Amino acid sequence: MSHSRHRAEAPPLQREDSGTFSLGKMITAKPGKTPIQVLHEYGMKTKNIPVYECERSDVQVHVPTFTFRVTVGDITCTGEGTSKKLAKHRAAEAAINILKANASICFAVPDPLMPDPSKQPKNQLNPIGSLQELAIHHGWRLPEYTLSQEGGPAHKREYTTICRLESFMETGKGASKKQAKRNAAEKFLAKFSNISPENHISLTNVVGHSLGCTWHSLRNSPGEKINLLKRSLLSLPNTDYIQLLSEIASEQGFNITYLDIEELSANGQYQCLAELSTSPITVCHGSGISCGNAQSDAAHNALQYLKIIAERK
């Protein structure tokens, strides 16, 4: 969640060889850049370097919450997230949205919903950049990529990346991190390619057909693993909670991402967040004497939460 406190007009970016510099072109010309990086480049060109300050850090609750404030010239925005990085990311994103809304900053983005691949040389096709252009064109938040899994032997590595756009999600796999990101972006573009601009279908409506694992589907699932969870006490010793959660995820069609928190807890324990790509997204906190124990505790808490949800009628 992001908040803007002051929406003063930002000075237009200037090139040395021409007039107004297009922030939109700067974003789309450099696909894969995070909002933090884009805002920093904007600040460099306008001589207003973004300044980030941590306003709140609450790690004692079930789900840690961080609030960061970013100031760029006369613009101040805040962002919240379950990690410092995510909070800064959202604060920068909010500032970019204000700059985008400024009439003095032009945005040269394609009018069609999808770029025309036939007009682009094959060696210049970039699904990551095309998806970013699509998000900017429709005023959506920029796509977020998360490396969720890395495995395979050294000579044949396989990476799995989760791409999120608003509440939409796709998973891509590849022999490199970049290839996995491209694959996830390509899946998004393929999904949107059948939507004509005339239909004016909002992203929210599109998401409704691809929600994946919802609370409703979880409660009514005939799956063996989820029904076993309903009958489990989740207190038996030597239970592999990470494996059990993974089996339920495979059965119910959602992904799990473990995010290690850099800061230790108040009593000196490691901390971790388990993020489940359910709809809505589930985030559970865990702690322990090691990173592995923290992940196991987060998985245990996630299982307890899923058990409560699945048993409700």
UniProtKB/Swiss-Prot annotation:
Tree of life domain: Eukaryota
PTM summary: Phosphorylated at Ser-246 in unstressed cells and at Ser-287 in stressed cells. Phosphorylation at Ser-246 appears to be a prerequisite for subsequent phosphorylation at Ser-287. Phosphorylation at Ser-246 and Ser-287 are necessary for activation of EIF2AK2/PKR under conditions of stress.
GO BP annotations, alphabetical order: antiviral innate immune response; cellular response to oxidative stress; ear development; middle ear morphogenesis; miRNA processing; outer ear morphogenesis; positive regulation of intrinsic apoptotic signaling pathway; pre-miRNA processing
MF GO annotations: double-stranded RNA binding; enzyme binding; pre-miRNA binding; protein homodimerization activity; protein kinase activator activity
Keyword list, A-Z: Cytoplasm, Phosphoprotein, Repeat, RNA-binding, RNA-mediated gene silencing
Gene3D superfamilies noted in UniProt: 3.30.160.20
Disulfide-bond pairs as recorded: none
CDD domains, per the entry: DSRM_PRKRA_rpt1 (cd19889), DSRM_PRKRA_rpt2 (cd19891), DSRM_PRKRA_rpt3 (cd19892)
Ranges of residues in domain DRBM: 34-101, 126-194, 240-308
Region (Sufficient for self-association and interaction with TARBP2): 1-103, 102-195, 195-313
Gene Ontology CC terms, in alphabetical order: cytoplasm; cytosol; nucleoplasm; perinuclear region of cytoplasm; RISC-loading complex
Localization terms from the record: Cytoplasm, Perinuclear region; Cytoplasm
InterPro entries from the UniProt entry: dsRBD_dom (IPR014720), PRKRA_DSRM_1 (IPR044465), PRKRA_DSRM_2 (IPR044466), PRKRA_DSRM_3 (IPR044467), RLC_Component (IPR051247)
Tissue specificity annotation: Expressed in brain, heart, kidney, liver, lung, muscle, spleen and testis.
Chain segments carrying region Disordered: 1-20
In-chain residues carrying the UniProt-annotated modification Phosphoserine: S18, S167, S246, S287
Pfam families in the record: dsrm
Subunit: Homodimer. Interacts with DICER1, AGO2 and TARBP2. Also able to interact with dsRNA. Interacts with EIF2AK2/PKR through its DRBM domains. Interacts with DUS2L (via DRBM domain). Interacts with UBC9. Forms a complex with UBC9 and p53/TP53.
Functional description taken from the UniProt entry: Required for siRNA production by DICER1 and for subsequent siRNA-mediated post-transcriptional gene silencing. Does not seem to be required for processing of pre-miRNA to miRNA by DICER1. Activates EIF2AK2/PKR in the absence of double-stranded RNA (dsRNA), leading to phosphorylation of EIF2S1/EFI2-alpha and inhibition of translation and induction of apoptosis. Promotes UBC9-p53/TP53 association and sumoylation and phosphorylation of p53/TP53 at 'Lys-386' at 'Ser-392' respectively and enhances its activity in a EIF2AK2/PKR-dependent manner.
Family classification: Belongs to the PRKRA family.
Domain remark from Swiss-Prot or TrEMBL: Self-association may occur via interactions between DRBM domains as follows: DRBM 1/DRBM 1, DRBM 1/DRBM 2, DRBM 2/DRBM 2 or DRBM 3/DRBM3.
UniProt protein name: Interferon-inducible double-stranded RNA-dependent protein kinase activator A
Taxonomic source organism: Mus musculus
